[in-house]
Design a protein with these regions (language model features):
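Short coil/turn linking the two alpha-helices of tandem helical-hairpin repeats
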Residues: 139-141, 146, 198, 224-233, ...
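C-terminal substrate/ligand-recognition segments
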Residues: 296-358
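Long, intrinsically disordered, low-complexity segments
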Residues: 25-29, 52, 94-97, 162-164, ...
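Acidic, glycine-rich segments characteristic of secretory precursors and extracytoplasmic regions
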Residues: 2, 26-65, 81, 88, ...
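Sec-dependent bacterial lipoprotein signal peptides
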Residues: 2-24, 214
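Polar, glycine-rich mid-to-C-terminal structural blocks
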Residues: 226, 269-298
Length: 442
């Protein structure tokens, strides 16, 4: 049966979350330790310094056990126990970041009288984009996860769901497909409010979330939509939805047309399937000037010291830059071209041009853009990224990967496609339910 999925704006997501309890303290995290709203009562740049800049500092953390790089490695599958400390550290890291984003949104609302309407919209869009990226990572790792929102957002969705705040203020999980809808919708909504410049172009937006970063995430989500839209992964993926049957509402004109004074007729939308949606956002990145010569699109390890008047100036020499060695997020145009080639092949198209652009840039001869060849080159050319596990799952090779030790491979089942919910999180929040297949390990 054709599955029609229209992902366009926030109210679509409300309908799918009618039974979800959304509250703001699921994990007993304390984002106030990293964000102090007491000083954010000055200029717009000072509000930025206290609400947005700390999110990037936290995102670029390199402390062992902090972040998601380590557990994405295939050798980390030696331990899939809910008691694994690394699993809990990654869960804690992601939800602390989400909690910080929610607090930032609340702080921006409180300081809105000191911001123009455009500044407020842009600030909140940037925070929501960071939060969506963190939710994307959490969904990819753990499957069914809780959704936590800011205070203002919770007031909107709580009446719609008919839920009431419990004494514990804990949130239940949502299905992975619902999380996917939410993330995709959030990114589509914030896109027009973000700067169009490259995240790695020196200036006030250096190292920050910009439109190319969000377009990359939307392309990646669409490419993996077959996986994320299927909730019964414990039974394998034979019955997963087909990319041609998953439909997305995509803005085909300038999404910022109404914001920048354009005509309503310029703000058009079109229904595309999952593969066409991936191709669409990959093309957006090409239109934005991304290229193999300047391969990086985003690197969360970038550090900058923002000048006091950063919102008013773009001079490169006014910002100090540095970069630790271990980025948690790194997006490259090589990945974009390989994603587009794969999506074209899966949509009965021809991905040779994009595929062989990547090979030529690496000094390799042209060859057929078969799915097997694309996966092989992704494993080599994107070895430093955190997408190898994700790629193997999408290609149906994860449980048979030659990169896994034989002892590990024999122990894996379809349940292993997602990680278990950490036992410490389950103990704290009685509304969380362990992922299928891991119950006996508790």
């Amino acid at each position: 049966m054709v599955m029609r999925r229209y992902i366009s704006h926030l109210f679509t997501w409300v309908i799918s979350f009618l039974t979800l309890l959304v509250f703001s303290s699921c994990l007993n995290e304390h984002p106030k330790d990293q964000l102090d709203g007491g000083g954010s009562n000055g200029s717009a740049s000072e509000i930025f310094d206290t609400t947005i800049a700390p999110l990037y500092d936290f995102m670029g953390g390199t402390i062992d056990g902090e972040g998601i790089r380590d557990i994405q490695r295939l050798d980390s599958l030696l331990s899939l126990s809910p008691d694994d400390e690394q699993l809990y550290s990654s869960w804690q890291y992601l939800y602390r970041a989400i909690g910080m984003c929610n607090k930032s949104l609340d702080m921006i609302d409180l300081q809105s009288v000191r911001l123009t309407d455009n500044q407020k919209a842009q600030f909140k869009a940037e925070v929501r984009a960071i939060r969506a990226m963190m939710y994307y990572e959490a969904m990819d790792l753990y499957g069914r996860i809780p959704v936590l929102l800011s205070s203002a957002e919770s007031l909107i969705y709580e009446p719609a769901s008919g839920s009431s705040v419990t004494d514990e203020k804990l949130s239940a999980q949502s299905e992975r497909s619902e999380i996917f809808h939410f993330i995709f919708s959030e990114l589509q909504q914030v896109l027009p409010y973000l700067p169009q410049t490259s995240s790695l172009e020196e200036g006030s937006h250096y190292g920050r979330i910009t439109q190319p970063v969000v377009n990359f995430l939307l392309a990646k989500l669409a490419l993996n939509a077959e996986i994320y839209m299927y909730n019964d992964w414990a039974q394998g993926y034979r019955k997963r939805p087909k990319g041609r049957d998953l439909e997305f509402m995509v803005r085909t004109a300038d999404g910022a047309s109404l914001i920048t004074g354009g005509k309503a007729s310029e703000n058009r939308s079109k229904i595309l399937n999952a593969w066409e949606t991936c191709i669409f956002y990959c093309n957006r990145l090409a239109d934005e000037g991304c290229s193999l010569e300047e391969d990086e699109i985003f690197n969360s390890s970038v550090r900058y010291q923002m000048p006091k008047d950063a919102l008013l100036m773009d001079e490169a020499d006014s910002v100090q830059y540095s970069r630790p060695a271990k980025p948690l997020f790194r997006f490259r145009y090589t990945d974009v071209l390989l994603m587009k080639a794969e999506a074209m092949e899966r949509n009965d198209g021809d991905g040779r041009a994009e595929y062989n652009m990547v090979r030529a840039h690496a000094g390799l001869p042209a060859r057929k853009s078969s799915l097997a060849n694309i996966l092989e080159d992704r494993q080599v050319m994107l070895a430093g990224e955190t997408c190898h596990r994700q790629d193997l799952i999408r290609f149906g090779k994860f449980l048979k990967s030659s990169h896994l030790r034989r002892s590990v491979q024999s122990a894996l089942t379809s349940c292993s496609i997602v990680f278990p919910i950490p036992q410490r999180s389950l103990a704290f929040n009685g509304k969380l339910v362990q992922n299928k297949g891991y119950e006996a390990m508790e």
